[in-house]
Amino acid sequence: MNMSNMAIDLVGVRKSFGDKVIVNDLSFSVARGECFGLLGPNGAGKSTIARMLLGMISPDRGKITVLDEPVPSRARAARVRVGVVPQFDNLEPEFTVRENLLVFGRYFGMSARTIEAVVPSLLEFARLESKADVRVSLLSGGMKRRLTLARALINDPHLLVMDEPTTGLDPHARHLIWERLRALLARGKTILLTTHFMEEAERLCDRLCVLESGCKIAEGKPDALIDEHIGCNVIEIYGGDLDQLRELIRPYARHIEVSGETLFCYARCPDEISVHLRGRTDLRVLQRPPNLEDVFLRLTGREMEK
């Protein structure tokens, strides 16, 4: 990639806490205008990477560049062009929606007049116009998350760093956040997104890095990763004797994984397997297209831990 077009560049980054390695020799780049995802279970190192990008903690070794600034040495210069959506809301609960935006803008040295001028458009973006004078403590979880996103845009940042932006939200609120993020990408914003939601990564990310125990185990476009590592239909089988089922369908399967009480069968011709399972009332069988959950299971031998 052309380095002048990079919003983020990590080379050989390592971070340990005591004897525990949290991020291990990690390298990746994020192009300006793209949504790049860090996908992995809790403990994979996603939040630690985000904190290093923001200059909140320093790597033990390696090189980090954010918006052409070396981090952490020039983290402050980079941060004025970065918007941050933390994993947990840190809004002022007794302030109104409008007051939260007004106060946050002052952290960037913005004048009261400038902040007042941008607040209406941020309220409209977050679909909170009718809640402008409502205390944050009275908002729903989805509304608080949209306000946190709007607050991160107060300084019109070039880059958004979002740590698990939809954790704890119901499906409707999650989809509304996704719609707002797609609107930002259409405006040319760059987004770094950490998530353990497979659907979120597939819907939003142009490219992603799959992490396991601080190590990169795969990187690429979501559909390319699915095609490379799975490339066929998936049959989930629950119930029965898994060892017997494995032997029964092995001749017709490209690959078989067992996770918990579920057998995952990857096959180019799933009908051949369905014929041999017909009439098995003790089984629950689901046939579906492959997804990123299958990629993670294929690479690690286990499901994504929420």
Curated annotation (Swiss-Prot):
Compartment(s) of residence: Cell inner membrane
Keywords, sorted A to Z: ATP-binding, Cell inner membrane, Cell membrane, Membrane, Nodulation, Nucleotide-binding, Translocase, Transport
- Which GO cellular component terms, listed alphabetically, does the Swiss-Prot or TrEMBL entry include? plasma membrane
Tell me, in one coarse class, where this protein mainly resides: membrane
Q: How does it assemble?
A: The complex is composed of two ATP-binding proteins (NodI) and two transmembrane proteins (NodJ).
- Function summary: Part of the ABC transporter complex NodIJ involved in the export of the nodulation factors (Nod factors), the bacterial signal molecules that induce symbiosis and subsequent nodulation induction. Nod factors are LCO (lipo-chitin oligosaccharide), a modified beta-1,4-linked N-acetylglucosamine oligosaccharide. This subunit is responsible for energy coupling to the transport system.
Q: Name one GO molecular function term.
A: ATP hydrolysis activity
Tree of life domain: Bacteria
Q: How does it sit in the membrane?
A: Peripheral membrane protein
Keyword Membrane assigned to the entry: answer is yes
Q: Does the keyword Mitochondrion apply?
A: no
The name under which this protein is listed is: Nod factor export ATP-binding protein I
Assigned protein family:
Belongs to the ABC transporter superfamily. Lipooligosaccharide exporter (TC 3.A.1.102) family.
State its Enzyme Commission number(s). 7.6.2.-
- Give one Pfam family: ABC_tran
Q: Where does ATP bind?
A: 40-47
Q: Where is the ABC transporter domain?
A: 8-238
Q: Give the organism the record lists.
A: Bradyrhizobium diazoefficiens (strain JCM 10833 / BCRC 13528 / IAM 13628 / NBRC 14792 / USDA 110)
